[in-house]
């Protein structure tokens, strides 16, 4: 039998559980991101520390792009307002009256050395200067312009982080960063842009950066070279003699006084014992010659048929044209 006091205690417990459930849900929602973030940080630390322990010079590690065959994980999408261009930088850019002045201020803010001498710095300067011009044309506020430039810079960093192809991952990352600035859900996202502004910014980035995605990756990432090696089953591995060994053998033969009759024997000994490679080469040559003969015979037959058709048509054209006899007789006066 349930007493009023027990029912009240049950009600209190249910109320406490209902109040704790959203908190637990929020903690569960946050826990994967925190675990992922810690895993990403640990992964990056391992990647940066293990080459330093393996080699003494870090320059050699940086020049080896094929050490890791998998692209690095992309960062978590976050709010990036005032991330690279703060409010003072935006005021300096707004005061620039001409495009040349704006490019000078932008090169100073982005810490670009000499864009006239470095092609990469010139490309970065063109990328962000055109982005600023687009933001001015759309009437973006300083906060929106700073966030748009930060999103573009984070996208560029994700692109050049690996020489491997990751255009789909970068596009998903860019769209998730856009949503962080279009939906009001603090502290994860804010409604900084309107829907029309988000669509315009997305179209601009797709038509400019993603259209030339491979060009940016080609310029800003090191070239990866893959060497292909083939192994044939059933064949013994070839033993290649270097030229130094051949020269040493020739010197030994010259030093040792041997009759000249033995020299041709030493030269002809390898020819008397054909290797499996020679047998394979002769077989390939015989098959190729056989196929070539069949192809030549087929071409000759086709040419002969075409000549016969042409000769029959010419013979039909050379025959005199015979007019049919008239039915009516001509009348004589």
UniProtKB/Swiss-Prot annotation:
Pfam families: CLAMP (PF14769). Residues 284-319 form a coiled coil. The keyword Coiled coil applies. GO terms for cellular component: acrosomal vesicle; axoneme; cytoplasm; radial spoke; sperm principal piece. The modification Phosphoserine is found at residue 34. GO terms for biological process: gene expression; single fertilization; sperm flagellum assembly. Transmembrane segments: none annotated. The keyword Cytoplasm applies. This is Cilia- and flagella-associated protein 119. It comes from Mus musculus.
């Amino acid at each position: 039998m349930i007493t009023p006091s027990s029912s009240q205690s049950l009600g209190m417990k249910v109320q406490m559980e209902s109040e704790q459930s959203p908190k637990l849900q929020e903690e569960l929602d946050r826990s994967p991101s925190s675990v992922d973030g810690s895993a990403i940080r640990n992964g990056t630390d391992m990647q940066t520390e293990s080459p330093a322990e393996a080699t003494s010079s870090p320059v050699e590690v940086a020049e080896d792009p094929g050490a890791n065959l998998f692209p690095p994980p992309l960062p978590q999408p976050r709010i990036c307002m005032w991330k690279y261009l703060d409010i003072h930088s935006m005021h300096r850019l707004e005061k620039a009256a001409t495009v040349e002045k704006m490019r000078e201020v932008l090169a100073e803010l982005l810490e670009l050395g000499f864009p006239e001498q470095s092609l990469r710095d010139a490309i970065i300067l063109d990328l962000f200067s055109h982005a600023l011009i687009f933001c001015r044309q759309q009437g973006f506020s300083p906060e929106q312009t700073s966030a748009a430039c930060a999103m573009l810079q984070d996208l560029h960093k994700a692109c050049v982080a690996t020489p491997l192809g990751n255009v789909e991952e970068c596009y998903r990352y860019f769209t998730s960063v856009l949503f962080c600035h279009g939906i009001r859900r603090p502290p994860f996202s804010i409604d900084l842009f309107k829907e029309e502004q988000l669509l315009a910014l997305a179209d601009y980035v797709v038509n400019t950066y993603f259209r030339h995605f491979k060009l940016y990756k080609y310029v800003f990432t090191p070239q990866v070279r893959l060497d292909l090696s083939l192994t044939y089953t059933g064949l013994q591995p070839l033993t290649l003699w270097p030229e130094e060994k051949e020269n040493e053998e020739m010197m030994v033969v010259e030093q040792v006084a041997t009759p000249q009759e033995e020299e041709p024997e030493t030269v002809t000994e390898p020819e008397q014992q054909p290797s499996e490679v020679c047998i394979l080469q002769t077989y390939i040559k015989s098959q190729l010659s056989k196929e070539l003969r069949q192809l030549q015979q087929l071409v000759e037959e086709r040419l002969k048929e075409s000549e016969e058709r042409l000769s029959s048509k010419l013979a039909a054209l050379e025959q005199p044209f015979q007019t049919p006899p008239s039915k009516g007789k001509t009348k004589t006066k």
